[in-house]
């Protein structure tokens, strides 16, 4: 199944954080916070204005992005976990 977000929504796959610190300390799952980084896997066409024009999304598939801790909605597609969020939820692009 392929999922295509609508309007200004973006489908993001979380990038998991390291499980071991630089000092070699293992971080158990119970002590980890949700990652706030991800890779864009699909984007919508853009936001529609009141007069019907479409404002295209500035992001593209493959961009690595930062987003807020509580941004987006968790979804599962074919057994994989993703976030679907609006373009406004993206804080920045990692270059």
UniProtKB/Swiss-Prot annotation:
Gene Ontology CC entries for this record? cytoplasm
Q: Which CDD domains match?
A: cpn10
Q: Which PROSITE patterns does the UniProt record give?
A: CHAPERONINS_CPN10
Q: Which domain of life is it from?
A: Bacteria
Question: Which UniProt keywords are listed?
Answer: Chaperone, Cytoplasm
Check the record and name the Gene3D superfamilies matching this protein: GroES chaperonin
| InterPro entries reported in the protein's UniProt record | Chaperonin_GroES, Chaperonin_GroES_sf, Chaprnonin_Cpn10_CS, GroES-like_sf
The processes (GO biological process) annotated in the record are: chaperone cofactor-dependent protein refolding
Molecular function (GO) terms for this protein are:
ATP binding; metal ion binding; protein folding chaperone; protein-folding chaperone binding; unfolded protein binding
| Claim: Glycosyltransferase is one of the keywords in the record | no
Give the UniProt subcellular location, in the record's own words. Answer: Cytoplasm
The subunit structure is: Heptamer of 7 subunits arranged in a ring. Interacts with the chaperonin GroEL.
Q: What does this protein do?
A: Together with the chaperonin GroEL, plays an essential role in assisting protein folding. The GroEL-GroES system forms a nano-cage that allows encapsulation of the non-native substrate proteins and provides a physical environment optimized to promote and accelerate protein folding. GroES binds to the apical surface of the GroEL ring, thereby capping the opening of the GroEL channel.
Family the UniProt entry places it in = Belongs to the GroES chaperonin family.
Give the protein's recorded name. Answer: Co-chaperonin GroES
Q: Which organism is it from?
A: Geobacter metallireducens (strain ATCC 53774 / DSM 7210 / GS-15)
